[in-house]
Amino acid sequence: MATFGAQTLGMDTTTSSSTGTFHLDIDPRPLFAAATDTATGVIAAVRADQLANPTPCTEYEVRELLRHLVGVMPRVAAMGRGDDPMRVTAPEVDGMADDDVIPAWRAAVEEAKAAWADGSALERTIVLPWATDTGAAALLGYVSEITVHTWDIAHATGQTPTWNEEAVGNAYGLIREWLPGVGRAEIFAEVRKKMGPAAAGAPDAFAEVAPVPDDAPIIDRLVAWNGRQP
């Protein structure tokens, strides 16, 4: 059972990830590895003249979104170690030199993978301001975030990466269970209360669902559920 904001959402889906659903007993670590591998390829292909490009994640330009991804990884590692991810001091990314982003990203990904090496972390209860769930579901939630931001960067820089269908499909299935299609403003108001001063002035993490056909590619359905128009 997962909780999101004031809502309680049952998670009992066990059908194919190609349809945008996920398995409760899936090990998300290979999916995390696949998502970060895709991200690494996209990040490495960004040119210097593209760093100021706007992205579909409207509060970030490409440069800022790259730094944001680096800053997310210590939270992923903290969850794997059993620490409170909201109390992690993220690396200083605001002024990170452009040439330092790729090595910092790669090092942070390896640290996160190592933190989840013990499979017992998948069964641990993880409490976040926006959800309470198993470690497996929480890690899969970050597969969703990493994939969506990878798409943001790819879209902003004219890249067409090959997506891992299993990773994207399971991430889409989870986020549909975690995040309702309506009432998001109210949900994030509750999340901000839980986050306290750290959330002051922050934009909604998810815009309203964008319309896409039911048979759209799974990556399009994932980003549309996260408020992007493919």
Where are these regions (language model features)?
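Glycine-rich loop at the start of a catalytic domain that most often binds anionic cofactors/ligands
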Residues: 68-69
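Extended, alpha-helix-rich binding/interface surfaces that flank or overlap catalytic cores
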Residues: 65
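Arg/Lys-rich, alpha-helical DNA-contact motif
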Residues: 73
